[in-house]
Amino acid sequence: MYTPVDPKVDFVAQERRILAFWRERRVFEQSVAQRAQGKSYVFFDGPPFATGLPHFGHFVPSTIKDIIPRYQTMRGAYVPRRFGWDCHGLPIEHLIEQELNLNSKSDVESYGVSAFNAACRSSVLRYVKEWQRTLTRLGRWVDFDNDYKTMDVCYMESVWWVVAQLWQRKLLYEGYKILPYCPRCATALSNHELNLGGYQDVSDPAITVRFECTSVVPGSPAAREFCAAASWGSASLPAHTCFLAWTTTPWTLPCNAALALGPQILYVLIEANDEHYILARSRLEFYYPDSSAYRVVWEKRGEHLAGIRYRPLFSYPVFGQGPDPSVQGDSEEGLFCTRVADFVSTEDGTGVVHVAPAFGEDDYEVFKDAGISIQCPLDAECRFTAEVADYQGLFVKAADKAIIARVQKQGALFRREQISHAYPHCWRCASPLIYRAVHSWFVAVEKIKDKMLAANASICWQPSHIRDGRFGKWLVCARDWAISRDRYWGNPLPIWRCVHCGATDCIGSRTQLYERSGMLLEDLHKHVVDMVTIPCACGSVMRRVPEVLDCWFESGAMPYAQQHYPFEHATDFERYFPAHFISEGLDQTRGWFYTLTILAVALFERPAFENCIVTGLVLASDGKKMSKALRNYADPNEVMDRYGADALRLFLVRSAVVRADDLKYSDEGVKDILKTVIIPLWNSYSFYVTYANIDGIDPPVCAKVDGMGQAVTRLATHLNNPLDRWILSLTEKLVQDIACALDAYDVSKVADPIVSYVDQLNNWYIRRSRRRFWKSINDEDKRCAYNTLYCVLKRCVLAIAPVVPFITESIWQNIRAADDVQSVHLADYPVCTPMVRDDALEFKMETVQRVVSMARAIRAQCNLKVRQPLKAMQVITRNPMERSALLEMEEDVLDELNVKELVFHEKEDEIVEYRAKANFRVLGKELGSKTKRAALSIERLSSAEIQEILEGTTLYLDVDGDRLELTEEKILVQRIERESLKAINEGTLTVALDTTLTEDLLLEGAIRDLVRGVQNLRKERGFSLVDRICLRVFSSDQDIVCARKAYDLHRSYIVGETLAAHVQWARVRDGASAVYVKSDAVLWEVSIDKA
């Protein structure tokens, strides 16, 4: 006997019981240990920060990161699942700064680096318990006890080894480049971090500035073009001519060094209001909408205008060139003259770009090889330094107003406006970033770019477009990676520099540091290693450079550092690298996926992972980003406590988010999965257990459902009922579909087969087989029904266990055989048995279901419920296989639709008349202006002619002398039902119902309504499925004649359907309560009692 099943189970409470079962029996640990001799399957888990609580963005990859390892484990693989924590970097530093009220780097240093790092260490894992509790509640199996932390000394040492390897391979260098810089965090960021913080719309001042031309550089293109030396004032070069340059960063004007022109852009010199300006021809209309307001003097391409000198707006010593930098340098290599650059565009502004090489990557490239010393006159918090004396100490963005005022006072302000544009912000503190020239240490990514592209080509991405799309394109444009940060709580960059000769060296281990310094350290953090000095060959000492590593470098090194490689696992590293599988969100194409790839290729010339599932972004239901401030989403823990984790998991993997698209989350989606999958599956299981207990059925002969499916094959050979063979075939299809999807790492194809299968099992197989379980005789057909339902339930549970682990465990615990493993997650995954698949039978049942669906649609249109019998259904099909299927399964069709007769016709025109209209979308391409005349001819086609076209015969029409070949796709066919018939067409099938209702049909429908009412009454009274009843039936006075007639005709049907031991035509006894059941023909009066 099975434990009785509550059909109204509390899934949330049940899931908590399963969690307790897993915990007490250590089922996860068993699942890993029992496969220890199996093939090793490597899974890398990207380390999250534990400084915040998990949210929906973590739930999507976490679900996938549970499904795949569960599946691989059931397939026999050894799959350790070690969790990890990202402990260093800006996230925790920013949090601690807020808590300690430290507002700048100077505040941190005043507080003390050692104390600050101690505060970071003590707080970095503050939400670990919440993470463990939440992910465990989701059903995710992962090893928290053996987790790795990026702040552990062994992890940090392996990261040092990685840095040393890059150093030895000449892939690490020190440089000075333009990088995005956070003034709040006072450190540079990598280009790949820009997308992590996102772009926000901001309003900035945009000004157009006059730069007055003074002369031309001898030998320059401009000198050749104008045949001028140093003078400016000829007819073609009027005095006081100005270039108009546009900028959205007025604060960079004190550092202006040049004006950039597009070499192929057409520029004009115009005269307007006795003034002369040079700007791009295509931008004239924006600045001068009235063309009569100016006169064009000449037009020239930018390449001919290089070398025109202009008067600088400011003369601050920011270029190391002396008091008058405008006269320094040879020809056009000097400052304050025009230069050509390919980055100049005419999408906005004037087509003339103000160049400040200390504040723009393109600007910096203009002067990269000019031999001019570029200085950045900003301090660590982006305030002007003494070089820009007038604005010293002022934050650059705050200086905009004063600088604009000064430009206006000088008469150089041509136009001022306010613009809104997208601007990058810091990914941790959300401050606007500043592009500025900074010192940093770089990984020479561009040297290995081709190898990275080759590695990417070997990776299986899901969705596949990521490989050559978002990730591949990012790799094509990959630039050297700035890995140093001017911060405190991080892994120190292990490079020492001599204070005297400047020699540098990289340390790759604690042992090497001990050998060089005599100090063996158990903590490698900044406040410790900064105290360690190393003797230099020159006789002086080497001190560590001050920077720490980008935390993304540490997460990219996790394949090696989590194993303490190469200090441990040096001989069996191939067992742990590369990963067979990883999964994270789309943003990690710029983050973890990228850093993993860089380091794996740099160290081993291979990818770090073989398969990657990329997920999209989970948005609130209104399409906005989920926000605590806006309160526009539910806590995911509350969702699980309302609907259960299984429903949430299946909802997520069925959504677009697993295809790297955005998901607008709504509780309704989870609720729908609960109603359409979880509850129906439970009902199927409940049905089996309930009737098996009634009949005393123990687990059938096929109880041991082994992975190879021999028992299923044996069962299939003994089944005669098509329904049994069909659901068995469909179960094997489910197994095959899920396995194929998971083998291909395409989780987007996992959910739909489950949804479809549960619907077929519950709403077709069990419903169509219900009478076989009801009957009192335990004959062969009944035994086959039990064996089949048991077998398919068990194989279904095994197949979907990785996806919905809770409900499958609950079912398994009750229906497993005595010699089965104690948990479904310790079992082998079922292997599809091709011999059991029956494609022909699946097609036949699909055809039956199509016809049933079409006929039900007709009933709905005519307001005819299925309990109302109908005389006949007419069917026409142009597919002989469909006709054969319907003939073979005619009894099922008639019973399902409550129709007395199934009539086949050869031609559709036997039940409908045709009318046709032109398909303008198709004909318009062929006939053009003659289409309307062809349409008139098509509307005059007879029903017989249209029938010929539908049967494949080609007709021809004469359209103004042109011969039109008329085929089915060129016409739109309307079907007009003949009298009393209602028809519907779908592809090769046409179905019609005779909706005429005779007295006998109406009476039989009334009896079916009566039976339905009695069944509902049994449920309301709490009667069991086997309880026999005493039934009294009567009717209202006005219906009594037809009611009694219906009762007499169908009394035996009433008895059989309601389990009535006694049935009487009589009024309800005095004192008893009557229930009234309404049908279209009769108002029934009913009372029941247990027999």
Swiss-Prot record:
<dbReference type="InterPro" id="IPR023586">
    <property type="entry name" value="Ile-tRNA-ligase_type2"/>
</dbReference>
<dbReference type="Pfam" id="PF00133">
    <property type="entry name" value="tRNA-synt_1"/>
</dbReference>
<dbReference type="Pfam" id="PF08264">
    <property type="entry name" value="Anticodon_1"/>
</dbReference>
<dbReference type="InterPro" id="IPR014729">
    <property type="entry name" value="Rossmann-like_a/b/a_fold"/>
</dbReference>
<keyword id="KW-0436">Ligase</keyword>
<dbReference type="GO" id="GO:0006428">
    <property type="term" value="P:isoleucyl-tRNA aminoacylation"/>
</dbReference>
<feature type="short sequence motif" description="'KMSKS' region">
    <location>
        <begin position="625"/>
        <end position="629"/>
    </location>
</feature>
<dbReference type="GO" id="GO:0002161">
    <property type="term" value="F:aminoacyl-tRNA deacylase activity"/>
</dbReference>
<keyword id="KW-0963">Cytoplasm</keyword>
<dbReference type="GO" id="GO:0004822">
    <property type="term" value="F:isoleucine-tRNA ligase activity"/>
</dbReference>
<dbReference type="Pfam" id="PF19302">
    <property type="entry name" value="DUF5915"/>
</dbReference>
<dbReference type="GO" id="GO:0005524">
    <property type="term" value="F:ATP binding"/>
</dbReference>
<feature type="short sequence motif" description="'HIGH' region">
    <location>
        <begin position="48"/>
        <end position="58"/>
    </location>
</feature>
<keyword id="KW-0067">ATP-binding</keyword>
<dbReference type="InterPro" id="IPR013155">
    <property type="entry name" value="M/V/L/I-tRNA-synth_anticd-bd"/>
</dbReference>
<dbReference type="GO" id="GO:0005737">
    <property type="term" value="C:cytoplasm"/>
</dbReference>
<keyword id="KW-0479">Metal-binding</keyword>
<dbReference type="InterPro" id="IPR009008">
    <property type="entry name" value="Val/Leu/Ile-tRNA-synth_edit"/>
</dbReference>
<dbReference type="InterPro" id="IPR009080">
    <property type="entry name" value="tRNAsynth_Ia_anticodon-bd"/>
</dbReference>
<keyword id="KW-0648">Protein biosynthesis</keyword>
<dbReference type="InterPro" id="IPR002300">
    <property type="entry name" value="aa-tRNA-synth_Ia"/>
</dbReference>
<feature type="binding site">
    <location>
        <position position="628"/>
    </location>
    <ligand>
        <name>ATP</name>
    </ligand>
</feature>
<comment type="similarity">
    <text>Belongs to the class-I aminoacyl-tRNA synthetase family. IleS type 2 subfamily.</text>
</comment>
<dbReference type="InterPro" id="IPR033709">
    <property type="entry name" value="Anticodon_Ile_ABEc"/>
</dbReference>
<keyword id="KW-0862">Zinc</keyword>
<dbReference type="InterPro" id="IPR002301">
    <property type="entry name" value="Ile-tRNA-ligase"/>
</dbReference>
<keyword id="KW-0030">Aminoacyl-tRNA synthetase</keyword>
<dbReference type="GO" id="GO:0000049">
    <property type="term" value="F:tRNA binding"/>
</dbReference>
<comment type="function">
    <text>Catalyzes the attachment of isoleucine to tRNA(Ile). As IleRS can inadvertently accommodate and process structurally similar amino acids such as valine, to avoid such errors it has two additional distinct tRNA(Ile)-dependent editing activities. One activity is designated as 'pretransfer' editing and involves the hydrolysis of activated Val-AMP. The other activity is designated 'posttransfer' editing and involves deacylation of mischarged Val-tRNA(Ile).</text>
</comment>
<comment type="subunit">
    <text>Monomer.</text>
</comment>
<protein>
    <recommendedName>
        <fullName>Isoleucine--tRNA ligase</fullName>
        <ecNumber>6.1.1.5</ecNumber>
    </recommendedName>
</protein>
<dbReference type="GO" id="GO:0008270">
    <property type="term" value="F:zinc ion binding"/>
</dbReference>
<keyword id="KW-0547">Nucleotide-binding</keyword>
